[in-house]
Amino acid sequence: MFLRSFLCLLCLLPSILYCADLEIHVRAESSLLPVNVSLLSSPKDTKQGSYLASLRDLFARDLALGDLLAPTKEIAPLTVFIEASYPELIFSIKKDGKGAQKIFSLELSGNPSKDHQSIHEAADRIHFLLTHTPGISSGKIIFSLCSTNSSEELKQGELWSVDYDGQHLAPLTNEHSLSVTPAWMHISHIPAYIYVSYKLGVPKIFLNTLSQPTGKKILAMQGNQFMPAFSPKTKLLAFISDRDGNPDLFVQSFSLATGAIGTPKKLLNEAFGTQGNPSFSPDGTRLVFVSNKDGTPRIYQMQIYPEQHPPRLLTKKYRNSSCPTWSPDGKKIAFCSVIKGVRQICVYDLASGRDEQLTTSAEHKESPSWAADSNHLVYSAGSSSTSELFLLSLITKKSRKIVIGSGEKRFPCWGAFPSQHIKKAS
C-alpha cells in the first residue's frame, strides 16, 4: 500500500488543415452540429463492402467523440462524403447544398489496425476543420497494467497502449518488472515517452518509444526517482527524487538526441515538505506540483523559466489534493481531491480562479490526463486492488469506462501526434 499511497500523494495536436473557402466553426457551449456522413462506394464484393461500412461507422463515432458534432445518416446542412475507390478514400465536405469540396485522401492497407488509425486521423482532421477544436480519436493512451499479491502491493506492471474505445490494445514494455507513471514527451512526430521502472531494484526514470520493448535509463543521479514530466518547449525534465533524504522537486535540461545536459537542479528546500506530481504549462515556463508543507497535500504553481519565482498556492478550496495536470490550451488544471472521503476529479480554471468537481461516484479516482482538445480527460478509478480507465467529458460532465479486460489499469497518459497517413487533395 505504501507504493500506491506515495504515488497518489505525489502522483500533440493534429496539424492544422487550412481551407480558404470553407469556414465552419462551432463552440463548445453550442448545441451539437448535425453532420451527415455518407459513404460513396461500389465494392467489388460483400466483404469489401462490409469493411468500408465499418470504417464509415468508425469515422462517425470518432467525430462524435469530441461532443461537438452529431454524425448522422439523415439529411443535414453539412455532409462529409467518403468516396471509396479502393484502396483510396477521398474525403469531401458539402455545405448548404453547394458543391462538394475535396479535402484530403488516404490509402487503405487492408490491415484493420493501420486502417483504423488512418480513419482516426481523418476524423480528427475533419473535426478540427469543422470546429477549430482538435479531434481526439487518434491519440494513444499509455498506461500501466498491473498485478497484485495478497498484500495488495503492486509487484509487476508492464506498459500498454490502447485507443479511446478500448481497441488495439498493445504491449509497450517487456521488462518483467513494475513500470509506472508513463508520460508522452510530445516531441513532434516521435512517439517517445518517459516512465519509472523498478527493473534495477529501485525506481529510476527511463526513456522509450513505441517500437522498443525496453527503455533506457536517462539519469545517473543517485536516489529514487519518481513522476517524470517533460516540456518540449524549454527542454526541461521535471521529476521527484529523495537523493537528499526528502522527496524533492528537481528539473534537468534534457535533449532526446544527447540525453541529460548538465546536472539536476533542486527547486525547493525541506521547508516545502514532501513534493510530488509535477506538470508543465504548455509553454514550459511554469510547473504545478503537490506539497504537504501545510500538513495536507495541496497544489502549488511556480514559474521556473527563464528565472525561478516563489511558489504560490493554486486552490484554497480543497486541502487534500494530488495529481495536477495542465491542459494543452493552458487554461485549466485538472487534479484529484478527497471530497467527503472519496478522491474525485476536479478542474481549476486559471482565468476565473474557480474550482469545479467533475466526478461524484464512490470509487477513488487517480491520474487524470488531458486529451488534445482540453475538453476531455482519461483517468483511473477503483479500489486498492482493482482499477479501470475512464473517459470524462468536461462538456457533458459524463464518464464512460474503457473496456480493456482484466488487471489493474493505472497511470494513464493521453498523447496526440501529427497525422502520418493523410494526403491533401490536389
From Swiss-Prot:
SUPFAM superfamilies referenced in this protein's UniProt entry, alphabetically: Tricorn protease N-terminal domain
Signal peptide: 1-19
GO cellular component: periplasmic space
Gene3D superfamilies named in the record: TolB, C-terminal domain
PANTHER family reported in the protein's UniProt record: PROTEIN TOLB, PROTEIN TOLB HOMOLOG
Keyword field: Periplasm, Signal
Protein's name according to its UniProt entry: Protein TolB homolog
Subcellular location: Periplasm
Top-rank taxon, per record: Bacteria
Family listed: Belongs to the TolB family.
Lineage: Bacteria, Pseudomonadati, Chlamydiota, Chlamydiia, Chlamydiales
Main location: periplasm
